[in-house]
Amino acid sequence: MAKLSSVNKNERRKKLVKKYAGRYAKLKAIAADSSLDDGERLIARLKMAEIPRNGNPTRIRNRCELTGRPRAYYRKFRLCRVQLRDLANKGLIPGVVKSSW
């Protein structure tokens, strides 16, 4: 199990990202638009810098739903490899079968 503080910190980050998502996307589009003059783009970048660091979507870490483990994460199942293997062997994940050839 991952430390509860790490899992909670990631949850706080998710809330901040959701809070600033609209503003962040709008400013990012302005900053990337090459048809605008450099002054407007610079202002957009400076406003992006004022958004809290944890409001940036890249700061979110994918974690296992059951254990909170941050590594070896399978997006399709939202589980780490350890839990995926355990649940698949027990037959608790529909459609997942052990391969043999």
Curated annotation (Swiss-Prot):
GO terms for biological process: translation. Keywords: Ribonucleoprotein, Ribosomal protein, RNA-binding, rRNA-binding. The keyword Lipid metabolism does not apply. GO terms for cellular component: cytoplasm; small ribosomal subunit. One of its GO terms (molecular function) is structural constituent of ribosome. It holds the Pfam family Ribosomal_S14. Part of the 30S ribosomal subunit. Contacts proteins S3 and S10. Binds 16S rRNA, required for the assembly of 30S particles and may also be responsible for determining the conformation of the 16S rRNA at the A site. Belongs to the universal ribosomal protein uS14 family. This is Small ribosomal subunit protein uS14. The gene is rpsN.
